[in-house]
Amino acid sequence: MSLAMTAFRMMAVALVVVVASSTTWARSLEGSSSPVTSLTRGRSLNKRAAFDPSCTGVYDRELLGRLSRLCDDCYNVFREPKVAMECRSNCFFNPAFVQCLEYLIPAELHEEYQALVQTVGK
C-alpha cells in the first residue's frame, strides 16, 4: 500500500470520526429525548405559555405581541431588568405599562393601546 493511499484512508477515518462526534454532540444539545419532547420538537404544548396567564380576554398573538414589544422597547431604553417584568404584569394593566406608554408612544395612540390592554385582559 502506498503512502498516499494510507494517508487518504487516515483522512477518511478522521472525517468519519468528526462527523459522528459532531452529530452526537448536537443531539446532546437538544436536551431530553422523551417521547413528548421529540413529538413537539421542544415547542410548548400550551400556545398561551409565552404570555401572562392573567390575560384572560381575547387571545390574539398580534395584539399581545404589540403590547409585549412596547415593554421590550421600554426595557431597552431604561435597561432595568424589572421594567420588562413589571410592564407585563397583570396582563399589562399596571402603572409601569402606562409610564412606558407615555414615554414611548405618541399621545394620539394612547387610547388605542389602552383598548388593546382591555381586549386581552378581560
UniProtKB/Swiss-Prot annotation:
Residues of the signal peptide: 1-26
InterPro entries to which the protein is assigned, alphabetical: Crust_neurhormone_CS, Crust_neurohorm, Crust_neurohorm_sf, Hyperglycemic, Hyperglycemic1
Tissue: Produced by the medulla terminalis X-organ in the eyestalks and transported to the sinus gland where they are stored and released.
Keyword Phosphoprotein: no
Domain of life per record: Eukaryota
Modified residues (Valine amide): V120
Annotated GO CC locations: extracellular region
Gene Ontology biological-process annotations: circadian rhythm; glucose metabolic process; neuropeptide signaling pathway
Subcellular location: Secreted
Keyword Protein biosynthesis: no
The entry's keywords: Amidation, Carbohydrate metabolism, Cleavage on pair of basic residues, Disulfide bond, Glucose metabolism, Hormone, Neuropeptide, Secreted, Signal
Disulfides per UniProt: C55-C91, C71-C87, C74-C100
GO MF term set: neuropeptide hormone activity
Main function: Hormone found in the sinus gland of isopods and decapods which controls the blood sugar level. Has a secretagogue action over the amylase released from the midgut gland. May act as a stress hormone and may be involved in the control of molting and reproduction.
Family: Belongs to the arthropod CHH/MIH/GIH/VIH hormone family.
Name of the protein: Crustacean hyperglycemic hormones 7
Lineage: Eukaryota, Metazoa, Ecdysozoa, Arthropoda, Crustacea
